[in-house]
């Protein structure tokens, strides 16, 4: 079975001085999709998100790392302020961090995040990455 080739891009793929960047000509030619980290929680924006987002010509997904103990509304307002998605973009909520929270708390926060994004974007294709 063949799977589509995609990559994940965040500030970690750039040098600290910004001189080394991903080669978007190669990425756009070889990849079928790209996931780009938009931010984390309610206060961090990946400093290379906009640059990466603007240089992609393949289907793209913006992902946001969720902190389960923080306000879902604040986190999703921050996410949507960064991304401003179109109806062809895909949004992904990254819920890999538990920060010592219970499964119930993590699930509750995720559900609130999904509800907020769906209500404020009309997008029903929001995915969760665990």
Can you name each region flagged by the protein language model?
Residues 128-130:
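Acidic carboxylate-rich catalytic motifs and surrounding loops in phosphoryl-/glycosyl-chemistry enzymes
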Residues 2-123:
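Substrate-binding cleft of extracellular glycoside hydrolase catalytic domains
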